[in-house]
Amino acid sequence: MGITVLKNEGLDFHARISTPLSEIDDDIQKELLDLTKKVKIAGFRAGKVPVSIVKKKYGTSVRNDIIERRINHSVNHVIKEHNLNIIGRPKIEELQNEPDKALEFTVKIELLPKITIPDLKKISLDRPKLEVNSKDVEEQLEKLAALTKSYTKESKAKIKDGVQVTIDAIGYIKDEAFEGGKLNDFKVVIGSNALIPGFEKQLIGSKTGSEVDVNVTFPENYHAKDLAGKDARFAVQIKSVHTAEPTVIDEEFAKKFQSNSLEELRTHFAKQIENESEEAINTIMKMNLFDKLEKLLDFDVPESLLEQEKNILKSETDKNDQDESLLKDKSPKEITEYYNKLALRRVRIGLLLAEYAKSKNLQLEPDDLRKVIMQQARNFPGQENMIFDFYKNNPRAIEGLKGPALEDKAVQYIFNNEIKLKEKKYTKEELEKYLEAEEQRITLI
């Protein structure tokens, strides 16, 4: 076997490999002789089939198998001999495979970069810490009390904020009833903003038995695209009005929600408020870490990984509403630059974290995968069980989660053992503003 290195620069390794015709013919002959002992052909005793007959029947397929084996063996030999850290499958080009000539081909191999892990202990980040106060907890208790009100007392008085109204309604656009615009025995609490903006307000002052024309404009971002931004009129009949007695937040109230005391329910809500912000904080902390890492990384990345990541980005953009896309007003050049920069960032950081996990011998545990599946499920409120069943019944889908799960584990290890974290305290209101601003920023990356 002859090997001529054509290129060994950066992340590209190209070589021309040749195998003498005599070696190919010897391999074929050995395979054919072996087959004479195994094949059964009518007219010949088992193990006594002439080589010429076997060659005539199986010669082409035997040769193809030998060529494939020789190519694989040669490529593996080159990889081992040159100690190549490859990514993806080697490409075979310029194949010379005539029966009367030596086997020759060019192999093109893409390499993983040599990654030097930066000194992560030099990185410092602020970590938001929510300080839950009594006002936050009382607001949650009041919301719970409002949600659990029982509207049992019928009222003949005029409709006002806080009452529950039962209505029938038919929606019209330009005097034509539209699909999905009919409501029957629909209950709504006035002031809850459960209906289109402006709808509930126009019912105030009416009474049971009244017929009211409600004029509204569907929001531009309304889920039904054929209605978004359009003016509509609803012919509404008020069927009944009910009020509720104020809910008293006391020990008995707490017991309705599996709490032994009101103080225990308050503690539960305080913890819940903290937990609700934790996932958003972790996501933003991860992006802030990546911002720091991006500035420290300058190694070349494999072109195939870069193209793969750009295709993923384009696919994500295509799935999103084009009217809301960050790229909707960008020129083709600007869009290309955006994809190139973001793909490079993602690939570099992904390779670094994989190398870091390897250096620390981080291994995935069942709990790590469960966490990632839970994160996936939270993206589909109301369909969590469907997501759990999907992963339970699709082992291949689980395989696709192992990369993100190991990345998350590496990030958490870095937070716990490497970088300096400085706790920064926020009230609930302050944290909400901070998270909103940060979420808008990270949509760009």
Swiss-Prot record:
Alphabetical list of Gene3D superfamilies matching this protein: 3.10.50.40, Trigger factor ribosome-binding domain (3.30.70.1050), Trigger factor, C-terminal domain (1.10.3120.10)
Main location: cytoplasm
Keyword Isomerase recorded: yes
Record-level GO cellular component terms: cytoplasm
GO molecular function: peptidyl-prolyl cis-trans isomerase activity; protein folding chaperone; ribosome binding
Domain PPIase FKBP-type: 162-247
Keyword rRNA-binding attributed: no
Keywords carried by this UniProt record: Cell cycle, Cell division, Chaperone, Cytoplasm, Isomerase, Rotamase
Gene Ontology terms: biological process: 'de novo' cotranslational protein folding; cell division; chaperone-mediated protein folding; protein transport; protein unfolding
Subcellular location: Cytoplasm
Catalyzed reaction equations: [protein]-peptidylproline (omega=180) = [protein]-peptidylproline (omega=0)
Domain of life: Bacteria
InterPro entries to which the protein is assigned, alphabetical: PPIase_dom_sf (IPR046357), PPIase_FKBP_dom (IPR001179), Trig_fac (IPR005215), Trigger_fac_C (IPR008880), Trigger_fac_C_sf (IPR037041), Trigger_fac_ribosome-bd_bac (IPR008881), Trigger_fac_ribosome-bd_sf (IPR036611), Trigger_fact/SurA_dom_sf (IPR027304)
Bilayer-spanning residue ranges: none
The protein's Enzyme Commission number: 5.2.1.8
Pfam families, per the entry: FKBP_C, Trigger_C, Trigger_N
UniProt family annotation: Belongs to the FKBP-type PPIase family. Tig subfamily.
Primary role: Involved in protein export. Acts as a chaperone by maintaining the newly synthesized protein in an open conformation. Functions as a peptidyl-prolyl cis-trans isomerase.
Notes concerning its domains: Consists of 3 domains; the N-terminus binds the ribosome, the middle domain has PPIase activity, while the C-terminus has intrinsic chaperone activity on its own.
Identification of the protein by name: Trigger factor
Organism ancestry: Bacteria, Pseudomonadati, Pseudomonadota, Alphaproteobacteria, Rickettsiales
